[in-house]
UniProtKB/Swiss-Prot annotation:
Keywords: Hydrolase, Iron, Metal-binding, Protein biosynthesis. One of its GO terms (molecular function) is metal ion binding. It comes from the Bacteria. This is Peptide deformylase 2.
Length: 177
């Protein structure tokens, strides 16, 4: 089921999410299915449970190709529950980000270029992966949602933050959301 996506300004997006306590429950399974339905319908690269009003540490991400980020490499489809992130170096890179909860805007955000993320899949099996580049950026962006952080809070240079249609006029109109 496609759920409504909360938008910046909704105070629920600023809450810290709670860890998932039980895996393989009908409720968790339904939540994850709804998250994928919602992300796919919105053509997103990822989605965090708080974006649909659920205060649980659940994020999903991944795509083969994403028309909102046409130059981005594929990212493996992942369900990540109760995640932790460990940067593998101090190296950071600026990159453009958008968000389904901040429609029509893009901004440049510094992110760690290489990291290790751990957590669990929907069955409670451990996940332990190394990510770099856009994959690492997506993981950090989605996990920020679990701490009540939206990407504009990380923008450092507001001359590089604005409406997608102005910043990227070459993108078709449907890329602006």
């Amino acid at each position: 089921m496609i759920r409504p996506i909360l938008k910046m300004g909704d105070s629920r997006l600023l809450r810290v999410a709670k860890p998932v306590q039980r895996f393989q429950t009908p409720e968790l399974t339904a939540l994850i299915e709804d998250m994928f339905d919602t992300m796919d319908a919105a053509r997103g690269a990822g989605l965090a449970a708080p974006q649909i009003g659920v205060d649980l540490q659940v994020v999903i991400f991944g795509f083969d190709r994403n028309d909102r980020y046409p130059d981005a490499p594929a990212v493996p489809k992942t369900v990540l529950i109760n995640p932790t992130i460990e940067p593998l170096s101090d190296a950071m890179e600026d990159g453009w980000e958008g968000c389904l909860s901040v429609p029509g805007l893009r901004g440049v955000v510094p992110r760690y270029t290489r990291l290790r993320y751990t957590g669990y899949d929907q069955h409670g099996h451990a996940i332990d992966r190394i990510a770099e580049g856009f994959h690492a950026r997506v993981v950090q962006h989605e996990c920020d949602h679990l701490q009540g952080i939206l990407y504009p809070m990380r923008v450092q240079d507001f001359t590089r933050f604005g409406f997608t249609e102005i910043l990227f006029p070459e993108l078709p109109a449907h890329h602006n959301d």
